[in-house]
Amino acid sequence: MAWPDLDPPRLAERPLSLQEALFVLEAPPEALPALAEAAIRVKEYFFGRRLKLVRLLNVKSGFCPEDCAYCAQSARSQAAIARYPLLSLEEILERAEEAQRLSARRFCLVAALRGPTPKVLERLGEAAQAIKARFPLELCASLGLLEEGMAEALKAAGFDYYNHNLNTAPSLYPRIATTHTYQDRLWTLKRAREAGLKLCSGVILGMGEGPKEVYEMALALRELGVESLPVNFLLPIPGTPLGDGRTVAGLTPERALKALILFRLLNPKAELRASAGRERYLGPYEPLAFRMVNSIFLQGYLTQPGSPWERDRALWESLDLDVEEGACG
């Protein structure tokens, strides 16, 4: 087929069709530079050259009753990770100060749970109020499934975003988790939206999906209108059901970059984040990825290490990207 129309305003008005998306995902190597430049143009049209730095904090580790196949903290996991109970208010504030020193713009508080307990809501509510009083940080909570009133409590405490990833396509979801459904995740995002929280929701690539499922994920997130969209690449963790790495065997740097390009083109106004696994899978294309995304995670993920801060800083400085600063609006 002929090249699709990749004009930024047009992409904002009408999503790519499945056929156009497959053109991107199945493009030959010689087309990759032009596709990457198109994605970069989209990013710069809507956001300029800004890059937002995001820091994660696992406020409790392990002991999750859910059975997500990718997760080292799940009920099915035998992974050798640190397991600890809910951090104290003082520990959370110390880590917020560290995030501020690292030039982070957003601080994400994460707990592996089916949903937040009253104790978790109280502790993180206190933390949010204290952080907002001291640091110019955007705040995001990721605490599992939300019941009535929980999103409102988080919003009132000062949280700006709620993260709840869709992770994969609906047709593949039963392979990934059985203790909750894809629809449960959609309901949680709906509750967060109704409470006035901005939505952070994304995917984990490398869990057995094909090109059509990648398109399905990117289109679903567009239809939800998510403000923040993390694209993760599976880090197989020994001791988890996906720990043997069989599902990522074909995830080459070219395929990883083309997937990121598609998420950019289908979600031109979303804050796209190159998330877990970018260091491993993007390889020589990581500089291109930095130019087409809005944000990156700093210094690792929930249970896995990431890129050193100094390395990432050298990369964004070499690309002349503008790191976001200032009080959150």
UniProtKB/Swiss-Prot annotation:
Its EC number is 2.8.1.6. It comes from Thermus thermophilus (strain ATCC 27634 / DSM 579 / HB8). Homodimer. [4Fe-4S] cluster binds at residues 64, 68, 71. Belongs to the radical SAM superfamily. Biotin synthase family. It catalyses: (4R,5S)-dethiobiotin + (sulfur carrier)-SH + 2 reduced [2Fe-2S]-[ferredoxin] + 2 S-adenosyl-L-methionine = (sulfur carrier)-H + biotin + 2 5'-deoxyadenosine + 2 L-methionine + 2 oxidized [2Fe-2S]-[ferredoxin]. The keyword Transmembrane does not apply. Binds 1 [4Fe-4S] cluster. The cluster is coordinated with 3 cysteines and an exchangeable S-adenosyl-L-methionine. Residues 46-275 form the Radical SAM core domain. PANTHER family: BIOTIN SYNTHASE (PTHR22976), BIOTIN SYNTHASE, MITOCHONDRIAL (PTHR22976:SF2). One of its GO terms (biological process) is biotin biosynthetic process. InterPro entries: Aldolase_TIM, BATS_dom, Biotin_synth/BioAB, Biotin_synthase, Elp3/MiaA/NifB-like_rSAM, rSAM. This is Biotin synthase. The gene is bioB.
